[in-house]
UniProtKB/Swiss-Prot annotation:
Subcellular location: Cell membrane
Coiled-coil regions listed in the entry: none
Membrane topology qualifier: Peripheral membrane protein
EC identifiers of the protein: 7.6.2.11
UniProt KW Nuclease keyword: no
Domain named ABC transporter: residues: 6-238
Protein name: Spermidine/putrescine import ATP-binding protein PotA
Assembly behavior: The complex is composed of two ATP-binding proteins (PotA), two transmembrane proteins (PotB and PotC) and a solute-binding protein (PotD).
Enzyme class: translocase
UniProt: ATP binding residues: 40-47
UniProt GO MF annotations: ABC-type polyamine transporter activity; ATP binding; ATP hydrolysis activity
Species per Swiss-Prot/TrEMBL record: Streptococcus thermophilus (strain ATCC BAA-491 / LMD-9)
Length: 384
């Protein structure tokens, strides 16, 4: 990693009035120009981290660094960061121009420069021409764009976003995900985004920190975290998962449901108890006699792009399957999957141990070749 723009070194936070510890020895580094997400449920500590970076809260212990310099005692207005709050915190009695220009006016920036910079900021968020519009006459998405324009007009090193999409409807929220991500890429500013929505985190982030009970449970790229969850919490919090108890017989061989299957994981003790994860979309429905497992369909829901089927095997384990075909309740079907579809989780493995094992035993991802090259390669393999 290049020199980090933001770093936390053994940062903890305890609220003195209640004695509640909300952050426990947090360590991380953030590179400049990337989109980071703090992902967790309510009370996990994600917003506390954001507020400590902003200077709205003090760390009880540990160091907070900006460009390698300790900023624990630096006041809010002296930090080169800007926060976009969930409520947007706009001034309702001011129009769009005055809201966006507010910080520049406080700094006594020349009037002509203010006009130029406001126009450029509004153009960035697709609100050019809205300068005189009343805040109260804007939609939720437009208000959010104004808040973002106000955040970027000072060209801060870091923009902090505290669940800014949560108040929007689904369609607008999806549109704003694209806009925020593209804006961050154009500006090259470090974004730190807080959310409880795993789909937002997966869609927008370069790097995700999954939080639970004041700790960072796992960090990595969206693909890393989705494909290789470190433990039961992450596997269930990020997407849907089928999780079963198993035993790692030896490297690349796991036993669950009374059968042994090839896998791509290793680095564990022989006969070590583990948890096995198979995602619903990785299960292929086959004829019963052709499947690696047989299950009986209990119920199903139509989700638009697929049917979500709930089925049970003869040991009573529940299976969720995603299929484009409708099942018949009560019918017995086969389930097929590949070794790459099986993800192994050790019990009580630390992130350091997990990262070391994954690096040694799991195959590295092939470089991205694009869709066309991938299609041509598949056809070549089929014809050879």
């Amino acid at each position: 990693m290049t020199n980090p723009i933001i770093a936390f070194q053994n940062v903890s936070k305890v609220f003195e009035d209640s004695g509640t510890q909300v952050l426990k020895d947090i360590n991380f580094e953030l590179e400049e120009g990337k989109f980071y997400t703090l992902l967790g449920a309510s009370g996990s500590g994600k917003s506390t981290i954001l507020n400590i970076i902003a200077g709205l809260l003090d760390a009880t212990s540990g160091d907070v660094l900006l460009d390698g310099k300790r900023i624990n005692d630096i006041p809010i207005n002296k930090r080169d960061v800007h926060t976009v709050f969930q409520s947007y915190a706009l001034f309702p009695h001011m129009n769009v121009f005055d809201n966006v220009a507010f910080a520049l006016k406080l700094k006594k920036v020349p009037k002509k420069e203010i006009e130029e910079r406001v126009k450029e900021a509004l153009k960035m968020v697709q609100l050019d021409g809205y300068q005189k519009r009343s805040i109260q006459k804007l939609s939720g998405g437009q208000r959010q764009r104004v808040a973002i324009a106000r955040a970027i007009i000072n060209q801060p090193r870091v923009v902090l976003l505290d669940e800014p999409l949560s108040a929007l409807d689904l369609k607008l929220r999806t549109e704003m995900q694209y806009e925020l991500r593209e804006l961050q890429k154009r500006l090259g500013i470090t974004f730190v985004f807080v959310t409880h929505d795993q789909e937002e985190a997966l869609a927008m982030s370069d790097w995700i920190f999954v939080m639970n009970d004041g700790e960072i449970v796992q960090s990595g790229t969206p693909v890393d975290i989705y494909d290789e969850p470190i433990n039961h919490f992450v596997a269930t919090f990020i997407g849907e998962s089928n999780i079963l108890p198993g035993v790692m017989i030896e490297d690349y061989l796991v036993e669950f449901n009374g059968k042994r299957f090839e896998s791509v994981d290793g680095g564990m003790r022989p006969n070590e108890p583990v948890e096995v994860v198979i995602r619903p979309e990785d299960l292929q429905i086959t004829l019963p006699e052709e499947g690696k497992l047989q299950v009986r369909v209990e119920t199903q829901l139509f989700r638009g792009v697929h049917y979500e089927i709930i089925a049970y095997d003869n040991l009573g384990n529940e299976w969720m399957i995603h299929s484009t075909r409708k099942a018949i309740e009560g019918e017995i079907i086969g389930l097929d999957f590949t070794p790459e579809d099986i993800h192994i989780m050790r019990l009580n493995e630390t992130e350091e141990e997990f990262d070391a094992r994954i690096e040694e035993y799991v195959e590295m991802e092939e470089p991205e070749d694009g869709l066309i090259n991938a299609i041509e390669e598949e056809r070549h393999e089929e014809n050879s």
